[in-house]
């Protein structure tokens, strides 16, 4: 199965790098992802990370719109203006840049969160809080699964 599942928290080293969990690196290898597309999530204080196919999916949505529409312009502003390409180093580490830190509040640890076709980088306590809120909202709505 080549999906990003589960979550893991890793410490940022003295040089500002963090090891991507091996299960996530395996998915990247299976998908032959060489370059990571990273963007500031639309809803959560997290950085969403995937391969070029993730960017292409959003660009197809923009192309389906009138190029001068507010929706197309807003989407481009978010995925192009709020996105960067990054690469893992030879040891499977990602540089935790100001782009990541400023948007997420990450300081010394990163929680990696699987989202099926991509994964996210979270500040650990923010992830725990968001997950608890999502669980609570589902419980209030009477949804079990």
UniProtKB/Swiss-Prot annotation:
CDD domains: MraZ_C, MraZ_N. It comes from the Bacteria. One of its GO terms (biological process) is negative regulation of DNA-templated transcription initiation. Signal peptide: none annotated. One of its GO terms (cellular component) is nucleoid. It is found in: Cytoplasm, Nucleoid. Keywords: Cytoplasm, DNA-binding, Repeat, Transcription, Transcription regulation. One of its GO terms (molecular function) is DNA-binding transcription factor activity. Residues 7-54, 83-126 form the SpoVT-AbrB domain. Pfam families: MraZ. PANTHER family: TRANSCRIPTIONAL REGULATOR MRAZ (PTHR34701:SF1). Forms oligomers. Belongs to the MraZ family. This is Transcriptional regulator MraZ. The lineage of its organism: Bacteria, Pseudomonadati, Pseudomonadota, Alphaproteobacteria, Hyphomicrobiales.
